[in-house]
Amino acid sequence: MSEELSAATSYTEDDFYCPVCQEVLKTPVRTAACQHVFCRKCFLTAMRESGIHCPLCRGSVTRRERACPERALDLENIMRRFSGSCRCCSKKIKFYRMRHHYKSCKKYQDEYGVSSVIPNFKISQDSVRSSNRSETSASDNTETYQEDTSSSGHPTFKCPLCQESNFTRQRLLDHCNSNHLFQIVPVTCPICVSLPWGDPSQITRNFVSHLNQRHQFDYGEFVNLQLDEETQYQTAVEESFQVNM
């Protein structure tokens, strides 16, 4: 961090990073009792999963905080005024713009996994089926990590960090945040590999950070992964037409 920021405030650069997702804070919120700061989304997710404790120190959190945490507006203002270095390319960026910078920083994307922009569908239903039957190294890699579906109908995956299996996307995310938060080992993301646009050769250097950034929702809830691009487009047009009638 610049000397100007260190002299002007009592904050260090680490204070601008969320202890849950390990990324620059997005809509920071602060706990009343222990004064720890998190991304709002990370905090609410932790409250939904773990209940009444601070995700960092296990301190108490009130019922009101769990539903509506207090914004850390002082920290937001400082993030708008001062800059820090991109962890990959070292370019100086205002802290509040850092996440936007990551979307165009090739070094960051090479380090932490797939691009934040999902490519257009270019795989037809037939080619997906054919690919699933193929005995290439790519399909072997997919089978290594993706398993059967759970009783809820969601696909399940094997954790590449400990090989424990039968995790849904959400359970894998929770498991890794609880057990592997500070374990940084180059692995292949099993969720990415399972998607039509997944690249089995893509290595993710910080798997837990990658999960928190890229896999906060199930893609299957928003798109039919078995349909090709043209069918997806036509479906979206028809649904939009129905909504606006």
Swiss-Prot record:
Cellular component, GO annotation: site of double-strand break
GO molecular function: protein kinase binding; single-stranded DNA binding; ubiquitin protein ligase activity; zinc ion binding
Annotated zinc fingers (RING-type), start-end: 18-58
Residues that bear Phosphothreonine: T142
UniProt keyword list: Chromosome, DNA damage, DNA repair, DNA-binding, Metal-binding, Phosphoprotein, Repeat, Transferase, Ubl conjugation, Ubl conjugation pathway, Wnt signaling pathway, Zinc, Zinc-finger
Name of the top EC class for this enzyme: transferase
Catalysed reactions, as listed in the record: S-ubiquitinyl-[E2 ubiquitin-conjugating enzyme]-L-cysteine + [acceptor protein]-L-lysine = [E2 ubiquitin-conjugating enzyme]-L-cysteine + N(6)-ubiquitinyl-[acceptor protein]-L-lysine
EC number(s) reported in the record: 2.3.2.27
Amino-acid positions noted as binding Zn(2+) in the UniProt annotation, renumbered to this chain: C86, C89, H101, C105
Post-translational note: Auto-ubiquitinated.
Domain UIM: 225-243
Pathway of action: Protein modification; protein ubiquitination
Role: E3 ubiquitin-protein ligase involved in DNA damage response by promoting DNA resection and homologous recombination. Recruited to sites of double-strand breaks following DNA damage and specifically promotes double-strand break repair via homologous recombination. Two different, non-exclusive, mechanisms have been proposed.
The protein's name: E3 ubiquitin-protein ligase RNF138
Organism: Mus musculus
